[in-house]
Regions:
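Contiguous segments within soluble domain cores/interaction surfaces
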Residues: 28-137, 141-142, 148-152, 156-165
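Short stretches within intrinsically disordered, low-complexity N-terminal or propeptide regions
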Residues: 8, 22-26
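Enrichment for repetitive, rod-forming helical segments
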Residues: 10-11, 147
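C-terminal segment of classical bacterial N-terminal signal peptides
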Residues: 15-23
Length: 172
């Protein structure tokens, strides 16, 4: 009898929306989510790197595989493009992976500046891919850049998986 009453009370509390969370806890949870999105994504990707290029090969199932060429986090301003090269976990549905390239805020810029949005659509048989970020028309300005990585058909606050950062230095 006591057990049924306790279960009934727990069920009523849950149906009523549960106990209210303290405001401090709710704020710290929201801050943790923002901090997590500013880190490299984990879980969905088995490999994820920025590189100066990529090399294509076939695996045992004759599926295209992409391997990074000259991976790093620092690139020269005369680079034609920066590539986001990745492998993802097997899945039951196709994946639409999007990347937003930003020139990161600094002393001269109050906000990140969006430079481009690129995407790739992977069928269920594809576990490897890349996104190419071409040199902007005005060239790569030396400084910090970031790539926000999303999954889905369009970019929303909920679609972001994480962020990668890199630096452009002046060519000699």
């Amino acid at each position: 009898m006591v057990r049924k009453t306790a279960l009934g009370l727990c069920g009523m509390v849950l149906l009523a929306g549960g106990p209210a969370l303290p405001a401090a806890f709710a704020q710290s949870s929201a801050g943790a989510d923002v901090q997590t999105l500013d880190l490299p994504p984990s879980g969905f990707f088995t490999s994820l790197v920025l590189a100066q290029g990529y090399k294509e090969s076939k695996d045992a199932f004759q599926t295209d595989r992409y391997k990074p060429v000259n991976p790093g986090i620092t690139f020269k301003s005369d680079s034609e493009a920066i590539y986001l090269v990745f492998d993802i976990l097997p899945r039951e549905s196709p994946a639409h992976i999007l990347g937003q390239l930003f020139l990161a805020k600094d002393a001269g810029r109050a906000e990140d500046r969006l430079l481009s949005e690129e995407s790739v659509y992977l069928q269920t048989s594809q576990d490897s891919g890349f996104i190419e970020f071409l040199r902007p028309k005005e060239g790569w300005a030396p400084g910090e850049y970031k790539v926000k990585i999303h999954i889905g058909e369009k970019i929303t606050d909920a679609s972001q998986l994480g962020t990668l950062r890199f630096r452009i230095i002046a060519s000699k």
